[in-house]
């Protein structure tokens, strides 16, 4: 059975293996053991209440409960940009016009932005390619909403998610090549590594501070603004069906889109509810997959179960209860895994 649980110190080698499979561009999951160990330690201290809000971040892993294999990782940053500036480009417009010459040009323009400062962030979503099946990707991504719903007071009103931009298998980023490299004088992979290992001072020091006309970029770079890496397209679709939208903010490195949503408008958060759980044999039927989570802050767990999402009393097997660290009579959080398709 696949289970979401909080990260542990012993997971560092498994996270290193996951990091080696990302192909670059996932800034928050660098193949650097010291950085990953520090990330785990920060998550543990967050759960223990030892960090200020500006440093808090939760990390979860997807584990096969039978073998102990760690198949994926996901995380939430509580409030971005309160210690180090959190940069985006806002894609806007500058108008140049002359009535005398009968000239009017509305030019797409990139503006350096810190507009998302203080927002909670969904980040570090990666599922081992060998495990991309049977709803694992949905479980990994949406489990975070169950945690946010259960512990709403820990998070801010807006949630953002930076989507991985277009990068090829050799680490070539058209957006970086046309823009970032001119100011940072380094390859994308180097900048990505520095950022992922916490060495972010260079961003503030070297970033262009003035608006940038996108027409000055190569056509290849212009074409990838706000576009996602092919492997990230499913993750984008998942978030958009939960209510997230692209509001013309992009990543400063690869040009990938930043999606955002008010936390209380996220479908899985808004529609999740608490039900009593009982042990038994679940009823047979054509039921949809649902997310089921306990309400235990320190020992949080999420699994998938096929059940009636409108039930008031959820029947789970002994194995499911054990995976959730629950007992009969406990209350668990339940929501349909995917939004119901509207029929005409």
From Swiss-Prot:
UniProt organism field: Escherichia coli O139:H28 (strain E24377A / ETEC)
InterPro entries to which the protein is assigned, alphabetical: Acyl_CoA_acyltransferase, Arg_succinylTrfase_AstA/AruG, Arginine_N-succinylTrfase
Recorded superkingdom: Bacteria
EC number(s) recorded for this UniProt protein: 2.3.1.109
One of the protein's GO biological processes: arginine catabolic process to succinate
Pfam families: AstA
Record protein name field: Arginine N-succinyltransferase
Family: Belongs to the arginine N-succinyltransferase family.
UniProt xrefs under HAMAP family: AstA
Function: Catalyzes the transfer of succinyl-CoA to arginine to produce N(2)-succinylarginine.
